[in-house]
């Protein structure tokens, strides 16, 4: 897959074993719960699930945005566009080689393949599968639609709810 961004680790918002953030282009369509992959040490891959997507500009405050719009004129046109990016926060859900240290600053972030999504969500480990539905990731040419299975022993039989 193509690179969609890079990991950001700052003094105020470091990467941890539980969370990481990355920047991406402001026109890239992502959704909460999409799965992303970060290249990590020992040629491993860390999987993250998107929790929050924010947009940030170089504006120091909301007041600066108001002033640059001719003091609140919604019809005013800006002479220059602000520099902006999308800032994405992810929850770490695993690593393919059991490497559990924070992902590093500047590492590339990718959309996950179908195989990587199954691995990240544990869908490749379901025993006694019975179809339960589908999960859809991404939009456009990157769209992935995957079947979701449940372990049939937990729906019916002695392990099931009574």
Positions of the model-derived regions?
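Basic- and hydrophobic-enriched, low-structure N-terminal and domain-boundary segments
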Residues: 1-162
């Amino acid at each position: 897959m193509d690179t969609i961004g890079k990991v950001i680790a700052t003094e105020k918002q470091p990467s941890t074993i539980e969370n990481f953030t990355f920047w991406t282009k402001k026109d890239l369509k992502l959704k909460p719960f999409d799965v992303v992959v970060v290249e990590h040490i020992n040629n491993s891959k860390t999987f993250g699930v998107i929790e929050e997507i924010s947009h940030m500009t170089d504006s120091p405050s909301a007041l600066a945005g108001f002033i640059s719009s001719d003091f609140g004129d919604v019809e005013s046109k800006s002479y220059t566009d602000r520099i902006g990016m999308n800032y994405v926060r992810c929850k770490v859900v695993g690593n393919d080689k059991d490497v559990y240290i924070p992902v590093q600053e500047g590492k590339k972030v990718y959309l996950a393949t179908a195989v990587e999504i199954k691995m990240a969500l544990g869908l490749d480990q379901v025993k006694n599968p019975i179809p339960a539905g589908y999960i859809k990731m991404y939009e456009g040419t990157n769209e992935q639609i995957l079947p979701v299975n449940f372990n049939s022993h937990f729906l019916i039989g002695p392990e099931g709810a009574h």
